Amino acid sequence: MEIKKIHQDFSVCKVMDYSLVNLNAEYSFIGKTDEEKSLVCVTSDVPPNVIQRDDGWKGFRVQGILDFSLIGILSKIAEILAKNSISIFVISTYNTDYVLIKKENYQKALDILE
């Protein structure tokens, strides 16, 4: 498994609506349920209509396209980091998984996973 560091800082947000979200930004993950509208984006791209936000996240992605039949990649990462008391925030796309970690634990997490 190869991981690729993402150099930008991320924010996890709750937004009123998506009207001010820049969907052309390099990273923009949105999630909508019956209870909330969420956005994860580069901190400098956070729109002004946020209700709540949590800054200070760094991330990496599992490099390459992950076939849906692959089992256990994300659980292995989560297990290794949990054993070292590092919490994660995960976003999955069609191709791969993105793992966000608070800045203060980011380098430690990378060192552990190498």
Language-model segments: which ranges?
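A generic structural motif
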Residues: 36-41, 96-102
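C-terminal structural segments of small proteins and small subunits
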Residues: 87-94, 101
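Regulatory modules associated with amino-acid/nitrogen control
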Residues: 1-80, 84, 108-114
